[in-house]
Amino acid sequence: MTSHIIPLALPKGTEKVCELCQKRAYLQCARCRVTYYCDAEHQHSDWIGIHKRICQLLIPIRTPSLFSMQRAGRIENLLKTKELIEICRLVAESKLSEGKHEEAVPAAQACLRCSVDVYGPNTVQLVPAYLLLADANMGMGNLALVAELMSQAEWAVLKSPECGYAVHHRLHRSMGCLHTATGHFEAALFHFANDIYFASEEYGLDSTVTCGGYFLMADVFVKQGEPAIVHSLYKEVAETWHSHLAKLLQSHIQNLQKNPDTTEPAFDKGQQVEVGKILRSILEFEQDETRKEPAQVALVAHSLAMLSYLGGDVTRVSHLPRSAEVNIRLTRSHVQLVNFPLRDCNSHNK
């Protein structure tokens, strides 16, 4: 993408800073001409991470004009900047769910920068951006930077006691992940317990968001060698996702019956990757257990089959364990799955 940059020529005494590292810039984006970089490597990283999505959107926001200094212009720029925040947030979340942590950094940084422009420094509205940036650096192993970002997020929350359950849930989840990565397991369990509480208050006990906390807590107990607790937590996660996917599948099949030419997958690709990792981890654990329950293995395998089908990846369905075709009765959640063989999945996509 080096063709998208030009050497920076500025009047003497005028300096610009790099979009990624805030060091002195020597290059300029040739398309928008309002974004600057210290070198071609940072330009390329930013282009892949977020800039190609927002390049032209930055022009009116970063170009001073008589209109932009008037009240109507300021309001318009504020709305455009809020739109940028949402775009950057969605891109960062998508890349994180796909495990592309390095690519998520520019989007998370842009989200944070725009959030500061709109809401000011040290405000609770910056917390989602702090956590996105922390999650990206967590995946890259930059734990010192993660701790710093988490401190800033925690301080913003402490100053805003009125902030909602969703913010607290996300903060505790990220804190739990940090303590898990640093080996402080008791602290991690404390934060995951709080994560589950706040998530259940915001989304409900049966929510897939809430069950994410159970899965992360189970990972801690895996490290502590507590298979019985792990099995119990995994069962909760597996049943929640199976129920959710079964409902999505039923709705998708109904849509196919109304519109047989539909080719769009019914499940977001990034989320499919993330949920697939969760379910495969549970399946691997249950298959290795000496006290494994065939119904639990079948439940998880069937969930993976539904996930692949909903994501449009039918080729992976045939490679799942055949136990996914058994009839399963879920007495705890009162959900009954009857006669849904994998071959029926394939027939819908022919």
PLM region spans:
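Intrinsic-disorder-linked linear interaction elements in eukaryotic regulatory proteins
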Residues: 1-350
